[in-house]
A protein has these predicted regions:
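Extracellular glycan-recognition regions
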Residues: 1-206
Length: 206
């Protein structure tokens, strides 16, 4: 939770790697943080390899996280991405990407990301609005993953154009406690490994 009213990050936020000033601008007077589209590493396989993930620890096994963001990709490039991600050795999220067909919102998942796993797209929808509300609901009822002592935590994703009516997208993501330890939720803004200074950005309100 954060309204981004300051000119530095609140302590609950952490970058996925050592901070680089080129990743973000903290506009406290506008109550938002701007994430600049930053090139992925040359050896990129998944978000596990991306340093400019802005994340915070999950507070419990039952809660809802909602993020309002405005995506401004550079029309010269294709493949710039942003979104809401639940990050761990397995991860899933709602990802906005500028493509040849326009902006597409996808629900993605990646198993064994720490071992070189690749992303899978579960569902996609074309969107025309630049501002969206992205949501993930975490839920656990105490049940365990079959054959283990791992707590079964389910994540369900949805999105909204107005912040009121949310539409589900994609599949339920199951996070096991063994991989759940240290899991975080947050956002990012990336582009393919294009080394120029005129990429797009994402403004995150909260």
């Amino acid at each position: 939770s954060d309204e981004f009213d300051g000119y530095t990050l609140s302590p609950q936020w952490q970058w996925h790697a050592n901070i680089n000033d080129k990743w973000a601008y903290y506009a406290g007077d506008r109550s938002m943080v701007r994430l600049y589209s930053y090139p992925v590493p040359d050896n990129y396989k998944s978000l596990w390899d991306v340093p400019n993930l802005l994340l915070q620890k999950t507070p419990s096994d039952n809660f809802t996280a909602t993020m309002k963001l405005t995506f401004r990709p550079n029309p010269k490039y294709k493949g710039e991405r942003t979104g809401l991600v639940v990050m761990g050795m397995d991860y899933a999220g709602l990802i906005l990407e500028n493509t040849e067909q326009g902006t597409v919102l996808s629900q993605i998942a990646c198993r064994k990301a720490d071992r070189g796993g690749t992303e899978k797209t579960n569902d996609s929808v074309a969107v025309k609005d630049s501002t969206l509300y992205l949501r993930v609901k975490f839920s656990a009822d105490g049940s365990k993953v079959k054959g283990t002592d791992d707590l079964l935590v389910r994540c369900n994703f949805s999105y909204s154009l107005d912040g009121k009516k949310f539409r589900p997208l994609g599949e339920t993501f199951q996070a096991r406690e063994g991989k759940w330890i240290g899991a975080k939720v947050g956002t990012f803004c990336t582009r393919p490994a294009i080394r120029t200074n005129d990429g797009g950005w994402t403004d995150v309100d909260w």
